[in-house]
């Protein structure tokens, strides 16, 4: 009887002790596939901290090759504005007219960079730790000066994320219509 109880206890410890490593390996395998692809497209709803005020944006993000573009879809006052990053340069435009890069309120990280920064962390970020909660998985990643927490569904499609710097949440991102190739 004691052997059976000891065996059951040992198996429980072995199985639960392997879960964090299994989660890490599954994420790293997914990250390698994403890094081996050429890009992704997704919709992002972003909440940005702009000097103590939370500002909400929505946009379509396309990351392909060395180019990233974000077209804002909400709020209505900025819908249609596009941000593009390629070859180390950035442009902000509306109907082919280049706009000033930092008009009005500024955030520590531009809301236009939320989607691309989130994608870069998924693709290149250093895995710190992660876990599971029911059908969702979480990975916490380091990318330069940022810490990015990403939440995935059971099929490893990103659902949401949080971008932090120095323990302060700068941006939160809700992901929809994820597609990678």
Question: Where do the model's predicted regions map?
Answer:
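Positively charged n-region of N-terminal signal peptides that target proteins for export
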Residues: 1-4
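N-terminal leader/targeting segments and the immediate start of mature chains
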Residues: 11-62, 181
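Flexible, processing/modification-adjacent segments and terminal tails
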Residues: 35, 46-48, 93-146
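Hydrophobic-ligand binding "helix-grip"
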Residues: 42, 71, 149
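Beta-strand elements of well-folded, non-transmembrane domains
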Residues: 46-52, 63-67, 74-76, 154, ...
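Short, surface-exposed charged micro-motifs
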Residues: 58-60, 80-84, 147-151
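An acidic-aromatic
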Residues: 62-119, 169-171
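Gly/Pro-enriched, hydrophobic low-complexity segments
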Residues: 127-181
């Amino acid at each position: 009887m004691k052997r059976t109880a000891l065996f059951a206890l040992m198996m429980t410890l072995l199985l639960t002790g392997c879960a964090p490593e299994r989660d890490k390996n599954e994420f790293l395998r997914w990250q390698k596939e994403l890094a081996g692809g050429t890009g992704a497209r997704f919709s992002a709803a972003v909440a940005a901290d702009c000097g103590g005020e939370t500002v909400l944006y929505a946009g379509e993000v396309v990351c392909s090759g060395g180019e990233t573009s974000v077209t804002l879809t909400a709020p209505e006052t900025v819908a249609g504005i596009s941000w593009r990053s390629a070859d180390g340069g950035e442009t902000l435009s509306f109907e082919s007219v280049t706009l000033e890069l930092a008009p009005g309120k500024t955030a520590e990280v531009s809301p236009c960079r939320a989607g691309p920064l989130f994608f870069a962390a998924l693709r290149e970020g250093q895995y710190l730790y992660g876990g599971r909660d029911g059908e969702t998985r979480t990975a916490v990643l380091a990318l330069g000066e940022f810490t990015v927490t990403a939440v995935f569904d059971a099929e490893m499609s990103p659902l949401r994320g949080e971008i932090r710097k120095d323990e302060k949440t700068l941006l939160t991102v809700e992901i929809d219509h994820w597609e990678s190739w």
